[in-house]
Amino acid sequence: FCATTATIVSGAMAERTKFLSYCVYSGVISALVYPIEAHWIWGGGWLADMGFHDFAGSTAVHFVGGVTACLGAWMLGPRIGKYGKDGKARAIPGHNLTAMALGVFILWFCWFGFNGGSTVAMASDDAMVSAGLVCFNTNLAAALATVAALITSWVRYGKPDVSLTFNGALAGLVAITAGCDMVDPFGAAIIGIVAGVLCIFSVEFFDNVVKIDDPVGAVSVHCMNGMWGTIATGLFSTSEGLLYGHGFRFFGVQVLGVICVAAWVLVSMTVIFTIIKKTIGLRVTEKEEIDGLDIHEHGLTSAYSGFSISDPTYAEMSVNENTDLGEDDITMASEAKINAAVKVVKEEPLPAELDSGMHKVVMICLLYTSPSPRDRSLS
């Protein structure tokens, strides 16, 4: 759980954070921030004594990681090229939806251990029934969150957005984690549906209003839905929930717990990020960000087997290999072919002393022609 809290932060701060800084703040989260708030919630602390309930970590793990991610991304600033001169967000899509899908389904499967395993023991019939309810609610919330995110993106952007749908699945898993043992399937369904919709609007809000650059949507998935799931437990708990006629006390304790944990994380991590920024530095240089952190931070040409980085300086090309559209017949081509074509321009060789890294980046950008529906709406 502690490791999960620390790794959530890396997604929102991706592509521009120094690796050493990542190691330092992850160590501080693991050694200081997480243990204190986890003690408040699970270790017989004051929130536990008040009756605060977080079964498997919507607040203790996901909300803490999400708040830290939001703060870190804000202090880092956006990636180069994320926002134009007019302030509008530009799409920087992920490189591999297949890998994303695989990762989501691995997480979904492992969440049965994350939530179901938090039952700790199955020595009695009651414990086994409880674990069964936990796993059922977990799967139901995730499935309905996925459908809700898909439909919401379809309605808003004209086509279903794959990446947002996957994030919706994770949002449902995060949200149900707090109360999966206290809510019935109806409550789990509502929690999941709201989580899927909330994830979509949250991504838009942070991209376009707050202008916090979160490459993977970690803040929307973990912070916003960790908060929603914890508060929703106060609403839908069959034994103590507000909507089941048990009054405001439990609901109020859930809200208070979220506020106090957020305050602790914001104060402690603001101090830590500020110290890192003033000493070893939090962000890489502009050149390192453009070239890629694989090269400068880890000494790798590329971390992705699907990418082959080569220097095109001396390449001889006369036609567009993608559309077979050369310079001579571009005037007769259809609008669709012109839009799809990558213009080939013969140039003199670059000077030997000029770093070709920028040239590679330009080539990669030119070859990108098909944004997702959400990305088109942001462009």
Predicted regions and their residues:
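Glycine- and aromatic-enriched membrane alpha-helices
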Residues: 1-364
